[in-house]
């Protein structure tokens, strides 16, 4: 038995799977308009199966979340998510007009509120986990957590702190 994504066998060595990123927690492959995050065997402090399942049911605009779960030999090994393309010709966020930048941040703030209402902590936000291609995205949920602490407002403050 090998990799299974949403009850379908997949072979990450096929040509249709292209590795597009490599990080501390794993590799990201591109296939058919999706990104597939595959955890390293030695990855620590990563999202667990229960949290990943929970996140697949939440809809956001610019904070990318898992949409299908990846298993290897019946063990949770990663997930697929929306592929956000980086365009090297695209303007950089520093050159973004102020009103456009404000709108991008407002959309992320709306997503932060949605996730805070669902008790999700945005953990591990850093520059490598953001993409700007005319739109601003947070792209790596591998360290997000479910926290049942305090009020939604307290969690939203923590999440805003992670983002800013």
Put a short name on every predicted segment.
Residues 62-104:
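Conserved structural core of kinase catalytic domains
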Residues 1-45, 58-61:
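ATP-binding glycine-rich phosphate-binding loop
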Residues 30, 38, 83, 131-132:
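Conserved hydrophobic "DFG−1" position in protein kinase catalytic cores
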Residues 91-132, 136:
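Conserved kinase catalytic-core helix
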Residues 34, 62, 79, 137-140, ...:
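Protein kinase-like catalytic core scaffold
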Residues 43, 88, 146-148:
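Conserved protein kinase catalytic core
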Residues 97-98, 117, 132-164:
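C-lobe/activation-segment region of protein kinase-like
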Residues 52-53:
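Regulatory alphaC helix of protein kinase catalytic domains
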């Amino acid at each position: 038995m090998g990799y299974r994504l949403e009850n379908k066998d997949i072979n990450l060595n096929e040509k249709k799977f292209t590795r597009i990123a490599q990080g501390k927690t794993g590799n990201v492959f591109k296939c058919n308009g999706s990104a597939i995050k595959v955890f390293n065997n030695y990855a620590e402090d990563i999202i667990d199966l229960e949290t990943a399942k929970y996140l697949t049911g939440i809809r956001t605009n610019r904070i990318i979340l898992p949409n299908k779960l990846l298993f290897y030999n019946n063990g949770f090994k990663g997930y697929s998510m929306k592929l956000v393309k980086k365009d090297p010709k695209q303007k950089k966020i520093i050159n973004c007009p102020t009103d456009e930048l404000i709108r991008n941040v407002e959309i992320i703030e709306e997503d932060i509120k949605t996730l805070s209402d669902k008790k999700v902590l945005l953990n591990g936000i850093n520059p490598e986990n953001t993409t700007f291609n005319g739109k601003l995205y947070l792209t790596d949920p591998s360290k997000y957590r479910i926290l049942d602490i305090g009020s939604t407002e307290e969690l939203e403050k923590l999440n805003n702190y992670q983002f800013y």
